[in-house]
Amino acid sequence: MENLFDKMNHLKVLVIGDVMADAYIRGKVERISPEAPVPVLNSRHYEIRLGGAANVALNLKALGAKVYLCSLVGQDSKGEELIKLIDAEDIGSEGIVRSQSRPTTIKTRIIAAGQHLLRIDEEDDRPAFPDEKSSLLKKALALTALVDAVVFEDYDKGVIFPELIQEVTALALKRGIPVTVDPKKRNFTDYKGVTLFKPNLKELREGLKIELNPKNSAELEAACKRTVSDLGVQGVLLTLSENGMAIYADGTYHHTPAMQRDIADVSGAGDTVISVATACMAVGFDLKSTLILANMAGGLVCEYSGVVPIQKDILVKEALLVLGEQSQ
């Protein structure tokens, strides 16, 4: 198993999707505003981190991979700051297109005493313009020819579009490399033929237009099986929050319960799950081990406040303990 984790250090992965900045304003609340019944925050600290598809890139980098990003950011100061953060992490930014028509997506969280008071979103989620789509497609195809795996990280912010999905997937599968997807509603049915499709329960309900009981294994298995059939995907990894995760591929269904954790913040857990699942598939972990490791990693990052990447050494240590026990 340790050899497979070591192989991650030689991976090259392309992440295509919606990059954004996760900003945090932390401070102290000691009074209510005289102007309206709202708390007054005395701001003490401001921080910007990489978010969205860029957080997936951070997670893959933390696992040892060389990562490239393909995305769209605004021709603005926040875009400049975001690209500087990406470059500082030694993540390839040559696939990023600058847009004159939209701002860089930024999500600002207002926090006091460890509690979220408010989130402010600055974004434009319209589809990319034709010239932007052309640039994105050209860059994505060039990078797909160089890597060992491709991730589509879709936040419905306009970066990903059907032609991009189809052409990148076709090239990747022709090269024999895995294509994994963290989908959203807009492009849900366009990810045909990908290697692994990772919706959460809400996304699967909306995508299939059905009700699902997260505690009913028969319903979940049937929904995963239908997704494989309808989209022609090779496998489905379904995240179920406190009910764990399930994976369906090759006619086989596995479920693993959520591990007991001290949850501080669930932000970014889905990014970690798709990152770990992608790396596991690219180096040769079997389906059940991929499920267990992705579930484990998603839980580990929830123990920290804010959006943070996985710590590989902690994941490896826990994986050796848990998977080692299961193999005995």
Model features per residue range: what roles?
Residues I96-R102, R109-T144:
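Conserved phosphate-binding/catalytic loop of the ribokinase/pfkB sugar-kinase fold
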Residues E2-L4, P34, V38-I106, E318:
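Substrate-binding N-lobe of the ribokinase-like
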Residues M8, T144-A145, F188-Y191:
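A short, aliphatic-rich alpha-helical micro-motif
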Residues L14-I16, R119, D148-V151, T180, ...:
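Structural motif
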Residues L146-V159:
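Short acidic, glycine-rich surface-loop motifs adjacent to enzyme active sites
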Residues G158-Y253:
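Conserved phosphate/ATP/ADP-binding segment of small-molecule kinases
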Residues M1-E30:
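Positively charged, low-complexity intrinsically disordered leader regions
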Residues D230-Q234, M259-V322:
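Conserved post-catalytic alpha-helical subdomain immediately downstream of the catalytic base
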